Amino acid sequence: MICGIDEAGRGPVVGPMVIAAVAGDGERLLQLGVRDSKTLSPTKREVIYARIIEVADCVNYVVVEPHIIDEYVRRRMLNSLELDFTARLIELCPAELYYVDSPDVNSRRYGDALSFITGRRVVALHGGESVPQVAAASIVAKVIRDRLIDILKREIGDFGSGYPSDVKTIEWLRLGKIPVECVRRSWRTLRYLNT
């Protein structure tokens, strides 16, 4: 069996990052319409997500809150964060082979590190969504993160996308409208706002 692992929310200044793992038959996943989550509308992602849950042998995810991300970033170890949490997911989803979308410029180094830590066969790829299980993990991660962001928006209002390039997000940050625990304090975006 093959397991794919991918993340959603690595770049935003607001909200968590979600890393997901999906193990199962690649052909069955493709029949569901699984492909890179970025190419699917939110509605289509939700529909496919529900189907993934039904047919996959294993679906698991971890939510990495902003304060945890900040701890790693302050030590200049964002890739290590993904390595640590991906290793946890590998332990939770048994498979013969793991395909992981690599955050490291050197995907082989990243895959080798995961293999060493977990004792499992891991192949790290850039743009791993060509592997159905990775594409499915991409959808799961994106749906979970979107749901968490929607909850936050219902609580405090629409702050935009949460990305540093979003003018609305920056304005909300500048005005202090987003709760501190929801913001990645280590992001350069905040340093620029505080100068």
Swiss-Prot record:
Entry's family note: Belongs to the RNase HII family.
Domain (RNase H type-2) ranges: 1-195
Entries under PANTHER family matching the protein: RIBONUCLEASE (PTHR10954:SF23), RIBONUCLEASE H2 SUBUNIT A (PTHR10954)
Reaction it catalyzes: Endonucleolytic cleavage to 5'-phosphomonoester
UniProt function note: Endonuclease that specifically degrades the RNA of RNA-DNA hybrids.
Keywords (A to Z) from UniProt: Cytoplasm, Endonuclease, Hydrolase, Manganese, Metal-binding, Nuclease
Positions bound to a divalent metal cation: D6, E7, D101
Subcellular location: Cytoplasm
UniProt-recorded Gene Ontology molecular function terms: manganese ion binding; RNA binding; RNA-DNA hybrid ribonuclease activity
Any Gene Ontology CC annotation: ribonuclease H2 complex
Manner of cofactor binding, per the entry note: Manganese or magnesium. Binds 1 divalent metal ion per monomer in the absence of substrate. May bind a second metal ion after substrate binding.
Phylogenetic placement of the source organism: Archaea, Thermoproteota, Thermoprotei, Thermoproteales, Thermoproteaceae
EC category: hydrolase
The EC number(s) this enzyme carries: 3.1.26.4
Cofactor names: Mn(2+); Mg(2+)
Organism (species): Pyrobaculum islandicum (strain DSM 4184 / JCM 9189 / GEO3)
CDD domains referenced in this protein's UniProt entry, alphabetically: RNase_HII_archaea_like (cd07180)
An individual GO BP term: DNA replication, removal of RNA primer
Family matches, as Gene3D superfamilies: Ribonuclease H-like superfamily/Ribonuclease H
Protein name per its UniProtKB record: Ribonuclease HII
